[in-house]
């Protein structure tokens, strides 16, 4: 390189260096400007974010039995949820159509509470509300008011407004109805940047996978785990446990008599789409079971980009409610009651009216704890939603909680109460007698009778209870008057609430103020007829009070409230004395003696049971009659055992059961189950979810269809080899119970 060329290169390099220095200077100046002059402004812009808070629903607490076995629990379900923050500029209705199609592919339902039908062939709509539902009527009224319509607006008017409001004119009529229903649900759930929208609940795993496969075309559509109520033992106390469900319109928006609107559940932290206890223990213990919801915070910057998602408040599960019942013992009592009713029908009720229903309640005498409360027929919590129509149409009323809400004439089971009243008041003593001639002739125009089964002549109170002598209790009841013996019956637990946590029938006693009162009604009431009606749980409470020598405890289902995570006892139900009859000397001992002799008058297992049982049967008349004019009869029973040191008390009713003594074997079966439970040898068939059985049956039927010829051959072979089976029939019932039905006409 010569000198000239070298100078050219140097000049060029110097020029490049100068240009680079100028550029660097400009960058440095710009950086200084940004940092020092506008630094605060840009920093604020960079950190300009918005936090959005979403509720994380807490798991509902469990309901367990006295041993800790779960009855009602929380399981994981999956909801299809729309998050408005993450949807971006996606066309909402197009996305909704896509989601609906995916749900339809998998036979899933989406939330649609709009009370309007699909369009008919002419494009017209009708309301689908129930005329008997005040909730539906209020929902329709609120919807019309919100849309600015008059209350006489038709379903077509409402749909027209919904289509216009949500700009659905371009869609076909069927799609207008679908999308209008979804938009209505969005409004109901207050869908917004801070409120996600639950579009479908408890979807299958197949649907979960389907939605996730289409996640790229469904921004903001999420699969969210949720807690759902499930029943590991759906057959245990379904009517007492109650149900959970959606918050209804009338509970969410409450209008008082002055027209003032309040939202009490919202003020307690509920959302419109939350689940809540709506009946039974689920409702009574809602505050304990509900738990505390958590909070998820999503942070979005000024450009709309989500920069952070975190749980800022961890949800706390609800507390566990522990019951006093042992689920195995409850199931054993359920089975014993069903077997007893079946036996009555097979052996005795061979005519036109079968024993189709009943109840049996077992209490712990020491503290009033409910050990079992059986209803027959009953229902399964796991089938309630799908089988509700069938249950509600069943004439045997499986949804009716007979144990707590059924009211029945007590019949001769009432006689021990009259005996207590007479002894405690001093009207009679252990030596007092009444001459039973078979006919009570005190009144000139009314001569009720007694069968004199096993007795006649002068009898004392112990003998009168043993043989259920009507004449004795007619005379004693007349001399006492209903005012006196009713007061004692009330203190013993009849005709009033027992104190259980859930809804129960009050019942009533026969009063002199009754419109149909006569002197004859007064003595009828003394043998448990008249206007007196009581519930099975009252009978059990009454029996327990007799066993406790006049001390009546509050009857209760709940043993304790537990911390779900640790099992720590947070509170425990203590025995609560509700009333006391002091007793005049040996009042309760004499009644006990009479009741302990009753089993010897009854055929069957109870007469030879190795443990002494104190009991009293009852056979009250029903209003219905045979063609001959003879009244149908219920079978009633109270009992406690062991008679000398009572542990349990029992109250039983069987509708159309005939004589009360027919429930004697049921008392023995309950006693056997109780003692087996105590020593750990009680064995019962485990609960099988009927939904699982249905699925297995469906699969089996598919297999059977392919093997029908072989099955038919096997059936013929089995039939040819089968030998006749002999049914063992219990000994006939020969007890005193005709006395209950022997009221002079």
Located regions from the model:
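Membrane-proximal periplasmic segments of bacterial cell-envelope enzymes
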Residues: 1-314, 350-359, 699-702, 710, ...
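Short, highly charged C-terminal tails/helix-capping segments
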Residues: 683-700
């Amino acid at each position: 390189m010569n000198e000239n060329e070298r100078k050219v290169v140097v000049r060029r390099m110097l020029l490049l260096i100068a240009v680079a220095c100028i550029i660097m200077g400009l960058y440095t100046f710009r950086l200084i400007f940004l940092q020092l002059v506008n630094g605060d402004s840009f920093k604020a812009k960079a950190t300009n974010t918005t936090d959005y808070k979403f509720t994380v629903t807490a798991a509902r607490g469990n309901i367990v039995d006295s041993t800790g076995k779960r009855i009602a629990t929380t399981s994981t379900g999956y909801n299809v949820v729309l998050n408005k923050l993450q949807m971006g500029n996606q066309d909402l209705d197009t996305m909704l159509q896509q989601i609906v199609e995916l749900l339809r592919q998998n036979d899933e339902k989406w939330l649609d509470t709009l009370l309007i039908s699909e369009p008919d062939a002419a494009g017209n709509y009708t309301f689908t509300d129930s005329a008997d539902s005040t909730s539906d009527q209020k929902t329709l009224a609120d919807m019309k008011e919100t849309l600015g319509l008059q209350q006489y607006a038709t379903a077509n008017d409402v749909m027209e407004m919904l289509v216009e409001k949500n700009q659905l004119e371009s869609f076909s009529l069927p799609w207008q109805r679908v999308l209008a229903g979804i938009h209505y649900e969005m409004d109901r759930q207050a869908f917004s940047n801070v409120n996600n929208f639950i579009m479908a609940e408890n979807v299958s795993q197949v649907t979960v996978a389907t939605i996730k496969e289409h996640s790229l075309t469904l921004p903001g559509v999420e699969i969210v785990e949720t807690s759902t109520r499930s029943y590991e033992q759906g057959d245990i106390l379904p009517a007492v446990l109650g149900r959970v469900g959606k918050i209804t319109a009338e509970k969410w928006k409450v209008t008082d008599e002055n027209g003032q609107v309040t939202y009490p559940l919202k003020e307690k932290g509920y959302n419109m789409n939350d689940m809540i206890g709506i009946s039974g223990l689920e409702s009574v213990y809602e505050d304990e079971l509900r738990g505390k919801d958590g909070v998820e915070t999503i942070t979005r910057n000024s450009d709309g980009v989500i920069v952070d998602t975190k749980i800022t408040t961890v949800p706390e599960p609800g507390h566990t409610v522990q019951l006093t019942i042992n689920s195995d013992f409850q199931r054993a009592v359920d089975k014993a009651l069903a077997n007893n009713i079946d036996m009555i029908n097979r052996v005795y009720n061979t005519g036109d009216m079968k024993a189709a229903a009943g109840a049996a309640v077992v209490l712990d005498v020491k503290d009033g704890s409910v050990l079992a409360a059986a209803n027959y027929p009953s229902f399964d919590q796991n089938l309630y939603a799908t089988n509700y129509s069938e249950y509600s149409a069943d004439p045997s009323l499986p949804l009716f909680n007979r144990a707590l809400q059924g009211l029945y004439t007590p019949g001769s089971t009432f006689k021990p109460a009259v005996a207590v009243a007479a002894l405690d008041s001093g009207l009679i003593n252990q030596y007092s007698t009444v001459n039973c001639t078979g006919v009570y002739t005190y009144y000139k125009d009314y001569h009720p009778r007694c069968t004199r089964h096993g007795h006649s002549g002068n009898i004392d109170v112990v003998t009168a209870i043993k043989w259920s002598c009507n004449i004795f209790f007619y005379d004693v009841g007349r001399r006492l008057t209903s005012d006196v013996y009713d007061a004692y019956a009330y203190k013993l637990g009849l005709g009033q609430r027992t104190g259980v946590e859930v809804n129960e029938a009050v019942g009533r006693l026969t009063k002199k103020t009754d419109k149909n009162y006569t002197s004859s009604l007064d003595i009828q009431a003394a043998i448990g007829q008249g206007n007196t009606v009581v519930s099975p749980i009252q009978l059990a409470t009454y029996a327990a009070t007799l066993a406790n020598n006049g001390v009546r405890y509050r009857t209760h289902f709940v043993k304790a409230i537990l911390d779900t995570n640790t099992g720590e006892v947070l509170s425990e139900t203590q025995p609560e004395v509700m009333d006391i009859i002091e007793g005049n000397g040996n009042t309760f001992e004499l009644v006990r003696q009479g009741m302990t002799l009753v089993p010897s008058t009854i055929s069957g297992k109870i007469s030879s049971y190795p443990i002494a049982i104190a009991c009293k049967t009852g056979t009250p008349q029903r209003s219905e009659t045979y063609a001959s004019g003879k009244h149908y009869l219920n079978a009633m029973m109270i009992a406690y055992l062991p008679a000398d040191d009572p542990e349990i008390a029992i109250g039983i009713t069987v509708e159309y059961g005939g004589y009360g003594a027919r429930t004697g074997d049921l008392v023995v079966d309950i006693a056997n189950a109780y003692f087996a439970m105590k020593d750990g040898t009680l064995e019962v068939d485990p609960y099988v979810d009927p939904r699982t059985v249905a699925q297995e049956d469906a699969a089996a039927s598919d297999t059977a269809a392919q093997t029908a010829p072989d099955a038919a051959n096997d059936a013929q072979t089995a039939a040819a080899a089968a030998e006749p089976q002999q049914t063992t029939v219990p000994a006939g019932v020969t007890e005193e119970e005709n006395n209950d039905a022997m009221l002079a006409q």
